């Protein structure tokens, strides 16, 4: 536990570090990031073991794959993306020189974030991601502004506090690197107490930045966080967590806090950015699916809810289906089975059991699924009613099914309206659609994507893929304010350091290989390693991480061999 004296000392160190960082050239900034990248690779095993310890996972569980894929793997990819951007800036060119730029709906530009290079094409074949810029941003201005704070490295922006997340272990490191390189701040990283087990390994991987007094890592409870964010030496705060925690920081708690929020009079006297989750939808467009399609996509949706035990800010919580879809019941039966049969794991996140009980108390008719009955599936929800599931992020294995009485294009339009208007938050939305359905909708399908007000939209993929894509942006849809924060303000990741970002759009294959190839969809990716029922996820995740630490052609066959057995 950190006391106020230690905090004062850490902030004094960072104050000195900021002055030195302002004089540090781009080449040296890149070199220190390369050392961090190397250290993440060297300590990846320790990183995963620490994560497994506080999540109470057995060392031989396939679920360890989640810790590789959401821990050192994206941290390595994020550092590598920033290194590439720094190299471009050093050379006097734009980070997006040579990157594919295309038109997107509504007068927008789309910057290709995935694939970025031949290895992406091979390892995530069939997946793509684009960063859509805000309407009116042209290619010339996008190129000029890419690089953000590293375009004027001497103009540092003070000390930033990063309040780390308690669920995914790459979030705090990635947010820290983003604040340093995008925003040109030095950083006091305060860990969520749930993740205190990560303190030793984080100190090791950040050692090059700690030695320069650019980073300090602190632990402690809410009292430490409160003292830290309100400290006069701190110029900015970034939090990953809940809107409730955000509002407590900005306005205080209790009736006084609520009154300050209503009056738009924050207690926090400095800017704050945030990533806060919400109620994420999965819109299932009706079509003619095979039995294998129904089973695979049911496992896909179950993964969107149950990955990391259900403790993800972008976990799906509301599945939206057409009540008149002939295959609705078959899909829901497959979804029940997928949720019920997913591997058992401990409920490590505080308050999870209480949140599951709260959902069940509202809907005692709901199904209790899983080996211990700890997962709740609530069917038959109706749009337009006062339904807690649509307004409350449960952050637990709770999934609702909303039925809309429409078909075809009308269903698609109404589902987008429902997601935009009735669900809390704007972090991520998923769409599942047969390729023939997408083709039949034509240009109107792109209009559906444009109309969804979400920071990441995934078509036949989980929005979590956007989180894993280092060059993609990650954050809420733009426009929220501190008194109506919803899923947050600002963004992170964004490996090209783009300005004027609106959203990321991810696309994936409707079917895994080899079935995708046999049915005419050229995508070579088998069942993804982030699926909760993937039997070789731990091996694949470890091999992908080792590859990302030190890429090489000779490492690819072993990755493919493991992935194909999943």
Which residues make up each language-model segment?
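N-terminal Rossmann-like NAD(P)+-binding subdomain of aldehyde/semialdehyde dehydrogenases
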Residues: 1-142, 179, 192-193, 205-210, ...
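Active-site proximal loops enriched in glycine and acidic residues that flank catalytic Cys/His/Asp
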Residues: 164, 191-193, 219, 238-241, ...
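ALDH superfamily catalytic-core signature
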Residues: 186, 203-210, 214, 224-226, ...
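Active-site-adjacent "gating/activation" loops or surface patches in catalytic cores
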Residues: 125-170, 174
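Hydrophobic/aromatic ligand-binding patch that stacks against planar heteroaromatic rings
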Residues: 178-179, 228, 418, 448
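Conserved C-terminal structural/oligomerization subdomain of aldehyde/semialdehyde dehydrogenase
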Residues: 2, 17-34, 153-156, 161, ...
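PLP-dependent aminotransferase-like
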Residues: 159, 171-223
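Short gly/pro/ser/thr-enriched loop/turn and capping motifs at secondary-structure boundaries
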Residues: 195-197, 244-247, 279-282, 464-468
């Amino acid at each position: 536990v950190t006391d106020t004296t230690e905090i004062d000392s850490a902030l004094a160190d960072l104050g000195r570090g900021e002055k030195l960082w302002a004089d540090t050239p781009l080449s040296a900034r890149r070199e220190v990031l390369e050392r961090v990248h190397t250290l993440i690779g060297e300590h990846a095993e320790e990183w995963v073991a620490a994560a497994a310890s506080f999540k109470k996972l057995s060392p031989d569980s396939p679920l360890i794959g989640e810790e590789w894929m959401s821990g050192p793997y994206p941290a390595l990819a994020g550092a590598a993306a920033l290194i590439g951007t720094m190299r471009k800036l050093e050379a006097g060119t734009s980070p997006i020189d040579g990157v594919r730029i295309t038109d997107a709906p509504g007068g927008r530009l789309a910057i290709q974030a995935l694939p970025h290079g031949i290895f992406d094409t091979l390892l995530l074949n069939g997946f793509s991601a684009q960063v859509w810029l805000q309407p009116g941003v042209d290619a010339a201005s996008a190129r000029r502004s890419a690089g953000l704070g590293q375009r004027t490295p001497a103009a540092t922006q003070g000390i930033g506090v990063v309040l780390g997340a308690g669920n995914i272990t790459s979030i705090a490191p990635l947010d820290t690197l983003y604040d340093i390189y995008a925003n040109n701040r030095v950083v006091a990283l305060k860990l969520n107490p749930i993740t205190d087990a990560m303190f030793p390994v984080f100190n090791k991987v950040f050692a090059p930045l700690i030695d320069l007094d650019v980073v300090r890592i602190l632990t402690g409870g809410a009292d430490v966080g409160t003292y830290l964010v309100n400290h006069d030496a701190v110029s900015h705060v970034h939090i990953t967590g809940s809107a409730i925690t955000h509002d407590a920081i900005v306005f205080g708690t209790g009736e006084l806090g609520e009154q300050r929020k209503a009056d738009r009079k924050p207690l926090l006297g400095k800017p704050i950015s945030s990533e806060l989750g919400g109620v994420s939808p999965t819109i299932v467009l009706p079509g003619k699916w095979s039995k294998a399609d129904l089973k695979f996509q049911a496992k896909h949706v179950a993964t969107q809810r149950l990955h990391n035990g259900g403790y993800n800010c972008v976990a799906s919580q509301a599945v939206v289906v057409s009540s008149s879809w002939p295959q609705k019941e078959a899909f829901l039966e497959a979804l029940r089975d997928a949720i019920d049969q997913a591997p058992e794991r401990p409920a490590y996140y505080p308050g999870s059991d209480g949140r599951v009980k709260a959902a069940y108390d509202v809907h005692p008719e709901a199904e209790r699924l899983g080996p211990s009955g700890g997962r709740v599936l609530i069917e038959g929800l109706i749009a337009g009613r006062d339904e807690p599931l649509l307004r409350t992020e449960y952050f637990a294995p709770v999934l609702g099914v909303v039925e809309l009485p429409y078909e075809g294009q009308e269903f698609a339009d109404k589902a987008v309206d429902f997601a935009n208007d009735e669900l809390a938050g704007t972090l991520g939305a998923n769409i599942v659609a047969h390729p023939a359905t997408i083709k039949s909708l034509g240009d109107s399908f792109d209009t559906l994507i444009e109309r969804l007000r979400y920071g990441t939209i995934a078509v036949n993929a989980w929005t979590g893929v956007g989180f894993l894509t280092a060059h993609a942006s990650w954050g809420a849809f733009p426009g929220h304010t501190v008194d109506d924060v919803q899923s947050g303000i600002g963004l992170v990741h964004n490996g090209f350091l783009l300005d004027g970002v609106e959203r990321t759009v991810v696309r994936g294959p409707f079917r895994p290989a080899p079935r995708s190839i046999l049915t005419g969809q050229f995508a070579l990716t088998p069942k993804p390693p982030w699926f909760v029922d993937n039997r070789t996820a731990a091996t694949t995740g470890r091999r992908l991480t080792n590859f990302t630490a030190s890429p090489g052609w000779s490492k690819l066959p072993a990755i493919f061999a493991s992935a194909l057995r999943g």
